[in-house]
């Protein structure tokens, strides 16, 4: 059984980098667009530096899905620039573990965690259907095909 846990610690970006690249590898040719590929590579390099020197920008919480000792999915919850919100980024699942509900479990854990801190989750995504199924609502739609979405806990407070 794959376990999902929340940890306040750094994740080895080399281990996480492979999952990030798999998650953005969604073109019909099986390759990331070059611009996205470069952005992902740069972000992974930044994460490696942060990991190696122990520097953490705003507080981050990692939601990890492991199959025994193997990292098979994760999400990162971090302080948002908006008061009362956490950003949820890099929800990634190993391609061999997809369609088992891990992405939903990771996202639900993030929403539950934010609620314990009296916060809401805000995400920017190109997969709004996935988050709508979990109760998120669209706050804005951008011409680029990306959406800004809010967690279900916010609706309950309005």
Predicted features by range, described:
Residues 2-21, 28-31:
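A short beta-loop-alpha structural element at the N-terminal edge
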Residues 20, 24-62, 66:
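Active-site rim helix/loop that mediates acceptor-substrate recognition in acyltransferases
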Residues 62-64, 70-79, 85-92:
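Conserved beta-strand in the GNAT
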Residues 66-68, 150-152:
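Active-site beta-strand termini and strand-to-loop segments that position acidic
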Residues 93, 99-112:
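Conserved acetyl-CoA-binding loop-helix of GNAT-fold acetyltransferases
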Residues 119-121, 125-146:
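Conserved active-site alpha-helix within GNAT-family acetyltransferase domains
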